[in-house]
């Protein structure tokens, strides 16, 4: 009886070990494992349309729409926006007014982006949010935006003018030096 139990236990342990080796790809092709991991990651990113707690994104016909309630995620070089691999397809960004912030580096490097519409209700734009959007020519910043952080529109070389509310706080180097910043009462 004890011997039979030990045999079953050893068999179960061997099965778990074999499954673990198969799942980690030990002894297999590294390129195949990396390719499989990249595909799984892409699938997860495409299926997960979250870009903040209660905030989602959708890309259709070149328009990236950010909607929901709350703050967008602040993205980084190590954790890029989930649409980063489609950045060259984005021509318009629409941010709904129930979203309270535009996340850091959210649209960085969207070189085909020409128009940004931020709805009234958004309170601030994080650092580097639109950095490197070299085709950007039109930005609609509502009166609700009270703070725009460093480099939010850095290297947006096609942008010539923007209008923001009079008491909107600007960090350093928010816009390229060639951009005319107009202040409106609000």
Q: Whereabouts are the PLM-identified features?
A:
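Bacterial N-terminal signal peptides that target proteins for export
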Residues: 3-13
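Structural signature of tandem-repeat unit edges
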Residues: 9, 62-70, 87-101, 111-124, ...
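Bacterial N-terminal signal peptides
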Residues: 13-24
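Sec-dependent signal peptide cleavage junction
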Residues: 22-47
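N-terminal segments that cap or nucleate solenoid repeat domains
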Residues: 43-95
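A structural signal for leucine-rich repeat
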Residues: 175-176
